Each structure stands twice: as structure tokens, then as C-alpha cells.
Design a protein with these regions (language model features):
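Conserved CoA-thioester-binding segment of acyl-CoA-metabolizing enzymes
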Residues: 1-55, 92
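N-terminal glycine-rich phosphate-binding loop for ADP-containing cofactors
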Residues: 8-10, 22, 49-52, 74-76, ...
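Terminal peptide-recognition signature
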Residues: 17, 36-37, 54, 67, ...
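Short beta-strand segments
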Residues: 18, 55-56, 104, 435
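Amphipathic alpha-helical interaction surfaces in cytosolic regulatory modules
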Residues: 32, 46, 59-73, 91
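Structural preference for long, well-ordered alpha-helical segments in enzyme cores
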Residues: 37-40, 44, 116, 317, ...
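Glycine-rich beta-to-alpha active-site loop
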Residues: 88, 93-140, 144, 312
Length: 672
């Protein structure tokens, strides 16, 4: 009795094979699913049908990929390679059948799902703009392991095939058709007819373009390999992210050879799967799921969002909410303050919404509201004005007089504690924080902030709203700087202290980037704005017992050198880019990396110890998605554990002896 597959043969002798994983919302290729598939393919091999069609029993979802949970059970590269090779042998039985075969894809088709579909002679994709076809393994520190490195190049060619695998970015059906990944586009009503027609007519199967086949000739492969390596090295270092380099080397050694490519792929997959990079990136994948599971289900429907404050943060929050389907009113003192936000919104919609009609509908959902009438209709009001306690409280008094029953008020404050803000409210327990990060369209985290006695129903609405607009919520307690800003502050502060000591700015940033940060801390300070960084540092200094180092920030702010927005900060900025002078031979401290990163790790441990976040997993997730902390290191607490807690504490003590008590290990280290 098959648990996950259903096989039927029609009067024409066509076998219709449907995958519908039992007790699951989505199809994944777990070991038992693959074993059952093997049994069906063995049977079909003995009694070949006139054609084979694979489809999914899940609505708008084909196959999500391999079961990542099973990867935790493997202990050696050899064990992983054996698993991959066994799966390959099962999938290759599809290609060995003497009849034409069709994979009818109805929705998300990622990783192993796309790999199995590429074993079929023909592939059908659904209509629509959704990007459902992809090989995202590289984002987990892996590469395709079920035959994808061979078949993607055989079908699409080295250019398009490698692009799919090296970026991990999915494509929609139109793009898939253009690069040869699928053969037809058909909807729910006609995919069966299209599949039957393909089996009956047997058109030529997709092959890589001639140019790509020439590029795969042995003498040319080393040249193409070097081009691919150059492309990848500009985005990821081999010691940080080895899998894209392994992918390129696989192709350089084997091309798209069916004879040697599959086994080599399995062995390479085994090696990358057992690296710290892959283990940590898989951990980050599961951390995303943990963030999404926060909060209870709520029946409250948020249709209308009212945002007060049309500055960079407020305006971009409003635009993002409109993009995600909400009706949004944006309030500020005068229309001239709202207009720049509307202009930025139009640019966002132009990039994100391809269809002109849908783009116009999206833009129509965002309305300027100088009078603030939208507050009376809103289900959720987000305050995003400047960081001033009295100004915010005056606004709250006016808003609560307008709000309809059941509406929720939230603040986007980055530094003021909720306990102080809410004292003027009639229902202080229903007041929450929704702290977004800049740029709103790029950074996926929102801190959902509470006080000790905050109403859980209000928090659940905050969680639902955050997830509904495609962001990751992080629950945290009201505390100075909350989580992300608090952890970032000592990192940026130490960078500015190094700058004051005369360490070249470029060398400071280089040390952080070499660790794996997305940009250096000096460039980050300039991007955030020196005035904002100074303000947050002041809040943290007064609200915690942490000492901030001596820096030049006050003098730069006094001169009006605020960073990128004024064209001058620590760096000179031209056309939105920092001009970084070459280091002039000034010696760089041996402990520069620890001086930058360990204060950040120390502050993360302090947040955990003080209960600002519930556990180390959530803290690591928040810092990764809120700051870009090197994902392949798994977060600050995970990094400390991998390096060794005793080793990190000893390093902090050494830094404290040399540079001051601000490096002293927090008492929370004893709890790790």
C-alpha cells in the first residue's frame, strides 16, 4: 500500500503518478517518499506504460525539495554521498523508461522537486508571475545533489543552468520557458490535455543551446570556469561559502556528463553538507520557521493601516504595507513632507509590480492624509515620527480620541522604552512596538515589542500583521535599544574608537567583511547617519551599565558630517557610494577582529541573560536578519559556542585588560 503516491493507468496506457505526501501540507522528498517512488518505478520498468505523467496532489504546490530535517541525522560526507547517489539512481529510472514522460508542475517546484522534474522528457509549468522554479541549495551552503548539476546544464546550458544554481534565485514559468527549463505553460483546466499531447506527438526534448555546448568542450571549460569563479568571488569568499565554488569545479571536471557527473555530484554534496557553513545555514533556515511560528492565531482582520510620520521610515513602512495589499493612509504635518515618500513608493512599486494595472492598483492603495482622517478608519495605527518622548505622547493623546473600538496603536520607536511612551494612553496594555529596519524593503525583520503586562491579543495582532506583510517578527521586551540596536551599538562604537586611534577606515571595514559581515561598521555608521547613531548610543549609555568608547562622533555631527545623507561622514560619499582611500601603511592591531565583533557577542549574551528575548535561537535569528550578522556563522551566540565559550570569555578579559572595562564579560556567560 503506497502512502505518499497514487498510480493510475488510463485506457490509452498512460500512467498518471501523483505525489501527495501523507499528513503534510507540502510535498518533500523524504527517504520514505523516495523509497515508495522506487517501488513504483520498478513496477513501471517491468510493465512499461505508453507514457508517464507526474503531478502533485497538493494545491498550488508541486515538490518543495528534499526533507532538510533528515540532514541532521548524517554524520559523515560518505553517508551523505550514499544517500544522494541512491536518490539519483531512483530518479534515473524515469529516464530509463522506454516511453515519453511529462512532469506537470502546478506550483512551487524547488530543489529536489525541480531535480526530479528535470529527469522527465518534458515539463509543464503553470501560468502566472510567481517564481516557483528554483535550485536554492546554495542558500543552505549546498548544491543540487539529486542530479541537478548535470541535468540543469544538459537542458538549459552552462549559462542559464549555472545562473539558477549559483544564485539560488527562482524564476517564473515565462522565464523557465525562455531558458528551456519547461516546454509548455498550461493551467489547471488544460494541463492534462497538454501532457497527453506531448506524449502522443513526442516533440524533440530540450537541449542546451549550441553556444553552451561549445563552452562545455574540454579545452574551453577551464576558461569558462575562471569566468564563473570571478563572478562568484565578487559576492562570496570561498572560505565563507564553499558550495558555489564546488559547483563550478564539478562542471569544470565533468561538464554535463551522465557517465561521471552524477557520482561526482553526490560525493561533492557530501563534502559541502558536512561543513560548518552548511550546518549553520541550515540552522538559519530553521530559525526562519521559528520566527514565523511566534504568536497565536487571531481572527482580527487588518485592512486599513494608518501611518503617522512620512519620513524615510514611516513613508517606506506605508509603501511596503500598500505593496502587500493593505489600504494605507500616510499622515504628516504638510503635503510637502508626504510627497517625497510617495515618490519613493512609486519607485518601489515600479520595481516590484510588473503588471501596469496591478501597479496602478497598488499605488491607489496608498493615500496622502494631511488631516489625519484615516486614523478613525484604521485597524492599526503605526506612529513613526521623530524620537522625542513628549511629541510622541502628544500625538497619542490626539490619536486615541479618533481611534475606532478595537483598533491597535503601535510605535516604530528605535530607542524609547514603551513603558515611558504609554503613560498617556487609556489602554496602555494594548500598546505595542513594531520596530522596522532601514531599508524597509530589504531588511526582513520587525521587532514586535512588549512590556511585562502587554495584552497577548495585541501582540498576536502584531505578529499576524508582521507575517502578513512578509516580514519575520521577533518578540522582545521593552528595553534600551531592544535587541538589534543594542547589539549593533558596541560594534559600531568600537569601530569609531579604532578610527579615533588612527586605524585606517578601510582596514576597520575590511576586518569586519573578512569575518563575514555584509558591510564594514564605518560604512554602516555613515549609512545609518551619525546623528542617529549618536542618539541611540546616548539612550543605551543612560539605560544600561555598558560603557561606550571614546569616539569623534560628536565633533563630526557638530560639523554637519552626518554620513551618506549629507555627502560626508567618516567617508566622503559620491553618488551614494563611499570613497574609500587606500590604507597608507599604518599598522593594524592584531586584535582588531575581536575588538569589533566580541563586544557585539557580549551584548547579545547580555540581552539573553536579561530576558530581552526568550532564547538564544530567537536572539541569533534577530541579529542575523536585523543586522546581517554573517549567516554562515549561525548568529552571535552560536558563533560563541562554536568558538568555545571559555575561549570567548578569556578573549574578552584580555581585551578588557588592554583596552578598558567596556570589554568585561557580562555575567550572563555563566548561563551558556
Amino acid at each position: 500500500m503506497s502512502q505518499h503516491w497514487k498510480l493510475e493507468t488510463d485506457e490509452a496506457g498512460i500512467a498518471w503518478l501523483c505525489i501527495d505526501k501523507a499528513d503534510a501540507d507540502a510535498n518533500v522528498l523524504s527517504s520514505d517518499v523516495i523509497q515508495e517512488l522506487n517501488e513504483h518505478l520498478e513496477s513501471l520498468g517491468k510493465n512499461p506504460p505508453t507514457g508517464l505523467v507526474l503531478n502533485s496532489g497538493k494545491e498550488r504546490s508541486f515538490i518543495m525539495g528534499a526533507d532538510i530535517n533528515e540532514f541532521k541525522d548524517f554524520s559523515s560526507p560518505e553517508e551523505v554521498a550514499k544517500m544522494c547517489h541512491l536518490a539519483q539512481q531512483v530518479f534515473l529510472k524515469i529516464r530509463a523508461l522506454p516511453c515519453p514522460s511529462v512532469a506537470a508542475v502546478n506550483g512551487v517546484c524547488l530543489g529536489g522537486g525541480l531535480e526530479i522534474s528535470m529527469m522527465f522528457d518534458y515539463r509543464i509549468g503553470p501560468p502566472g508571475d510567481s517564481k516557483i522554479f528554483g535550485l536554492p541549495e546554495v542558500k543552505l551552503g549546498l548544491h543540487p545533489g539529486f542530479g541537478g548539476t548535470v541535468r540543469a546544464v544538459q537542458i538549459c546550458g552552462v549559462r542559464a543552468g549555472m545562473q539558477l544554481m549559483l544564485t539560488g534565485n527562482p524564476v517564473n514559468s515565462r522565464k523557465a520557458l525562455k531558458i528551456g527549463l519547461i516546454d509548455r505553460i498550461a493551467g489547471e483546466d488544460d494541463w492534462r490535455d497538454v501532457a497527453t499531447s506531448l506524449i502522443a506527438t513526442r516533440p524533440p526534448v530540450q537541449k542546451a543551446p549550441l553556444v553552451d555546448r561549445i563552452m562545455g568542450i574540454g579545452l574551453l571549460r577551464p576558461i569558462v570556469r575562471n569566468m564563473l569563479i570571478k563572478q562568484v568571488s565578487g559576492k562570496a569568499r570561498k572560505d565563507h561559502y564553499p558550495s558555489p565554488y564546488a559547483m563550478i569545479d564539478l562542471w569544470a571536471a565533468h561538464g554535463a556528463s551522465s557517465k561521471t557527473g552524477y557520482l561526482a555530484e553526490a560525493e561533492s554534496f557530501g563534502r559541502v553538507a558536512c561543513t560548518d557553513t552548511s550546518r549553520n545555514l541550515i540552522r538559519v533556515f530553521f530559525l526562519q520557521s521559528k520566527l514565523k511560528k511566534q504568536g497565536n492565531k487571531t481572527d482580527v482582520e487588518l485592512k486599513h493601516i494608518h501611518v503617522v510620520g512620512a519620513g524615510v521610515m514611516g513613508g517606506d513602512i506605508a509603501a511596503w504595507c500598500a505593496l502587500r495589499g493593505h489600504t494605507v493612509t500616510l499622515q504628516d504635518r504638510e503635503q510637502k513632507y508626504i510627497d517625497p515618500a510617495l515618490e519613493r513608493a512609486q519607485k518601489l512599486f515600479g520595481k516590484r509590480v510588473r503588471d501596469e494595472k496591478k501597479r496602478a492598483e497598488t499605488a491607489a492603495r496608498l493615500k496622502a492624509d494631511v488631516s489625519g482622517d484615516g486614523a478613525a478608519e484604521a485597524d492599526l495605527i503605526i506612529e513613526a515620527i521623530f524620537e522625542n518622548l513628549e511629541a510622541k505622547q502628544d500625538l497619542y493623546k490626539a490619536l486615541q480620541a479618533k481611534m475606532k473600538p478595537g483598533a491597535l496603536l503601535a510605535t516604530n520607536t528605535s530607542s524609547i522604552r514603551l513603558e515611558e511612551l504609554r503613560t498617556v494612553l487609556d489602554e496602555p496594555k494594548r500598546f505595542i512596538g513594531l520596530h522596522f529596519f532601514n531599508p524597509v524593503a530589504m531588511l526582513p525583520l520587525v521587532e514586535v515589542i512588549r512590556c511585562e503586562d502587554t495584552d497577548q491579543a495585541a501582540m498576536d495582532i502584531g505578529f499576524a500583521f508582521t507575517k502578513g506583510i512578509g516580514k519575520f517578527p521577533l518578540e522582545c521586551m521593552s528595553a534600551p535599544g531592544f535587541v538589534v540596536n543594542r547589539v549593533l551599538a558596541p560594534y559600531m562604537g568600537e569601530a569609531m574608537a579604532l578610527a579615533k586611534e588612527g586605524v585606517p577606515l578601510e582596514e576597520i571595514d575590511k576586518a569586519a567583511v573578512n569575518f563575514g559581515m555584509p558591510m564594514g561598521p564605518i560604512e554602516l555608521v555613515d549609512s545609518v547617519g551619525l546623528d542617529i547613531a549618536q542618539h541611540v548610543a546616548g539612550i543605551l549609555t543612560s539605560g544600561t551599565d555598558r560603557e561606550m568608547p571614546d569616539t569623534d562622533i560628536a565633533g563630526l555631527v557638530k560639523k554637519g558630517h552626518l554620513g551618506r545623507k549629507t555627502g560626508q561622514g567618516y567617508y566622503l560619499w559620491i553618488d551614494g557610494k563611499a570613497v574609500k582611500p587606500a590604507a597608507d601603511g599604518v599598522p593594524v592591531p592584531d586584535d582588531i577582529e575581536d575588538r569589533l565583533l566580541l563586544p557585539m557577542v557580549n551584548e547579545a549574551v547580555a540581552c539573553l541573560s536579561e530576558g530581552v528575548v526568550a532564547d538564544s535561537d530567537l536572539l541569533d535569528a534577530g541579529v542575523i536578519f536585523g543586522t546581517g550578522f554573517a549567516p554562515f556563522r549561525g548568529g552571535p551566540v552560536n558563533y560563541a559556542r562554536e568558538r568555545g565559550v571559555d575561549s570567548v570569555v578569556a578573549a574578552l578579559k584580555g581585551l578588557a585588560e588592554r583596552h578598558g572595562e567596556r570589554f568585561a564579560p557580562h555575567s550572563g556567560w555563566s548561563g551558556l
